[in-house]
Amino acid sequence: MSADITETPAWQALSDHHAEIGDRHLTELFADDPARGTELALTVGDLYIDYSKHRVTRRTLDLLVDLARAAGLEERRDAMFAGEHINTSEDRAVLHTALRLPRDAKLVVDGQDVVADVHDVLDRMGDFTDRLRSGEWTGATGERITTVVNIGIGGSDLGPVMVYDALRHYADAGISARFVSNVDPADLVAKLDGLEPAKTLFIVASKTFSTLETLTNATAARRWLTDALGDAAVAKHFVAVSTNKKLVDEFGINTDNMFGFWDWVGGRYSVDSAIGLSVMAVIGKERFAEFLAGFHIVDEHFRTAPLHQNAPALLGLIGLWYSNFFGAQSRAVLPYSNDLSRFAAYLQQLTMESNGKSVRADGTPVSTDTGEIFWGEPGTNGQHAFYQLLHQGTRLVPADFIGFSQPTDDLPTADGTGSMHDLLMSNFFAQTQVLAFGKTADAIASEGTPADVVPHKVMPGNRPTTSILATKLTPSVVGQLIALYEHQVFTEGVIWGIDSFDQWGVELGKTQAKALLPVLTGDKSPAAQSDTSTDALVRRYRTERGRPA
């Protein structure tokens, strides 16, 4: 739907409602509705999702659901799951949800049973990783592979590295993984440091097998390998995740060891496709299946739950509530789990590449802000970095707190009497409580604080948070978390009327970089650039590289 949502009665009703309740404090909202602490919460799969500490009333939620219906959210959701071409600018289906359908499901899109195709690739991935993990697959010298190096960028890197970090505790076959993405040579050099060529396998992840950064790194990695083991070693030390057999073969990779995916999978939605091969190599096909099943739990919830009880829809609508009615520009994602240290970076691509759009699907300009800026760090690190702004700054930053009741690792506290995990989680609960309810000047003064210091210690509260609590960080839970955010992104995109599944904004910079490369490297002084800033920068760079300016 691409009509101007801001002109609908549902939008106007929300605007009027915001004028009525926008300044109400969470302390007051809880006093008026004590049951909200348990009733404004949902359990989805293994996730307990508490959204009671948001600046919403039950009436707000009703109006947000009305807005979703006015935008056609349910119809667009059903169209996505059915395989309709909802990516209109590229005329493609959007079927990342098909990547986690069970084997006995059936979904025919454009005359093709995509479930059968998905499980054919999964079976091939499973066979390959079984051989790798058992030691049946060896390198050129007959030695067992102990390190997998994934070479990719964007969705071919951010997803796998995040999931690997989250699930490395499930590694059980003596295989570890490293990830190379940046065309800065320092990245590849650092990741190859200490590795033995004979025990290293490279996964080159590029759908077209022509991505500049990925192929540049892959070529350098091949040189590192062949310098040690000879050209014939490439076939035993490189596999590909791609759909371009010709270029894969020309690179020297046996196309029997090429794992494909489809145009209906966007890069930022692809970690549960063959792009996750590095993860499967480390944790095994059975746990990878648990990972996929976690996605499917949330997919089915999003597909079938009424909007009032639909966690991704509600969280997406609440995010839009802050973006469009409170003027919030960003959302902090704060996992109280060091294993999720890359989760915020992963969500940056998922959310910002999807919804960072300024035109609607029909090409007309949007009439409201779109796209939340996602950022964050694990707790408690962030508490000693940027929480000051969350608590006492002038900007409203809604925050998502993610935590677990059972740790992947635990150690005793300094005095030996307690659990470090309990200490971590006490900070989780304390931060959401203080962000919501704060501490008044009267309460601070009553403690004997000097009058001139009181204003500096006031904690205003009324800072909104979502709390997501699961028992433990398992493969299934990681899948559930990713799907929870995927469908929030979809919800917001539908309301804004944008195409959340293209990314034209990344293309022009790539084209211009190709044009500028010979300008930087040529033997002769280059022609003037079209703007004086770039011209001066290029000439300074050439001078410092020892080339004629």
UniProtKB/Swiss-Prot annotation:
Single Gene Ontology BP annotation: glucose 6-phosphate metabolic process
Superkingdom classification of source: Bacteria
InterPro entries assigned to the protein according to its UniProt record, in alphabetical order: G6P_Isomerase (IPR001672), G6P_Isomerase_C (IPR023096), Phosphoglucose_isomerase_CS (IPR018189), SIS_dom_sf (IPR046348), SIS_PGI_1 (IPR035476), SIS_PGI_2 (IPR035482)
Cellular component annotations (GO), alphabetically ordered: cytosol
Enzyme kind, highest EC tier: isomerase
Record has RNA-binding as a keyword: no
Protein name according to UniProt: Glucose-6-phosphate isomerase
Species whose genome carries this gene: Mycolicibacterium smegmatis (strain ATCC 700084 / mc(2)155)
